[in-house]
């Protein structure tokens, strides 16, 4: 019974957290300013309806933080997550990136793990050559794992990237506890 409660709590953690945040934020009665949730849903909808590009995702590496794992565990883990994915994306008027994606890759146990969601990155172009770009943002989506019986699990993770032109090396870090989580995951994203 305790295990079932933990599974349900994990399953609805993101939903409950977002609901609490939305309820606790003050309403801006009579202003034209949108709340963060309306901005988020508008960006997702616009990316779905009006994509500028289609993207190919190629998983590149997973790395289990050695300080957070027993060596006997990391020796058994897969850190070459072959797979692939597809997405659509756009750049907004501020130069920020928005993307919708689905991807499947081999996880730490060499089992298939699907993930899909929305990603956003604030983008900087620090060099005179505007093709070079750096990004920092988040992804919100859903994944499912073999060791969790493929029950859909919401994810909210940081994103970072470095790119040149249509090729971007994008990455995230999955936080966790000892021998669980604490995984760096990166992929190439090619924009067409």
From Swiss-Prot:
Keyword hit for Membrane: yes
Chain positions of site Role in lipopolysaccharide recognition: 73
Gene3D superfamilies according to UniProt: 2.40.160.20
Reactions this protein catalyses: a lipid A + a 1,2-diacyl-sn-glycero-3-phosphocholine = a hepta-acyl lipid A + a 2-acyl-sn-glycero-3-phosphocholine; a lipid IVA + a 1,2-diacyl-sn-glycero-3-phosphocholine = a lipid IVB + a 2-acyl-sn-glycero-3-phosphocholine; a lipid IIA + a 1,2-diacyl-sn-glycero-3-phosphocholine = a lipid IIB + a 2-acyl-sn-glycero-3-phosphocholine
Keywords for this protein: Acyltransferase, Cell outer membrane, Membrane, Signal, Transferase
Region forming the signal peptide: 1-29
GO cellular component: cell outer membrane
Pfam families: PagP
Positions of the record's site feature: Role in the phospholipid gating: 178
Compartment annotation: Cell outer membrane
EC number annotated for this UniProt entry: 2.3.1.251
Gene Ontology terms describing biological process: lipid A biosynthetic process
One Gene Ontology term of the molecular function aspect: acyltransferase activity
Residues annotated as the enzyme's active site: 64, 107, 108
Annotated function: Transfers a fatty acid residue from the sn-1 position of a phospholipid to the N-linked hydroxyfatty acid chain on the proximal unit of lipid A or its precursors.
Family stated for the protein in its record: Belongs to the lipid A palmitoyltransferase family.
Subunit comment: Homodimer.
Protein name from the UniProt record: Lipid A acyltransferase PagP
Annotated organism of origin: Citrobacter rodentium (strain ICC168)
């Amino acid at each position: 019974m305790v295990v079932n409660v933990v599974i349900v709590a994990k399953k609805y953690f993101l939903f409950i957290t977002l609901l609490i945040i939305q309820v606790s934020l003050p309403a801006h009665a009579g202003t034209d300013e949108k709340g963060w949730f309306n901005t988020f849903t508008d960006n997702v909808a616009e990316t779905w309806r009006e994509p500028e590009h289609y993207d190919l995702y190629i998983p590149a590496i997973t790395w289990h933080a050695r300080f957070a794992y027993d060596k006997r565990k990391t020796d058994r883990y897969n850190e070459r997550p072959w797979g692939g994915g597809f997405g659509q994306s756009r750049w907004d008027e501020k130069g920020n990136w928005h993307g919708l994606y689905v991807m499947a890759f081999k996880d730490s146990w060499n089992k298939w793990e699907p993930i899909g969601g929305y990603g956003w990155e604030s983008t900087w172009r620090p060099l005179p050559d505007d093709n070079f770009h750096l990004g920092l943002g988040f992804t919100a989506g859903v994944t499912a794992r073999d060791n969790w019986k493929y029950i859909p699990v919401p994810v909210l993770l940081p994103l970072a990237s470095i790119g040149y032109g249509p090729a971007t090396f994008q990455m995230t870090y999955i936080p966790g506890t000892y021998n669980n989580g604490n995984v760096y995951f990166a992929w190439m994203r090619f924009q067409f």
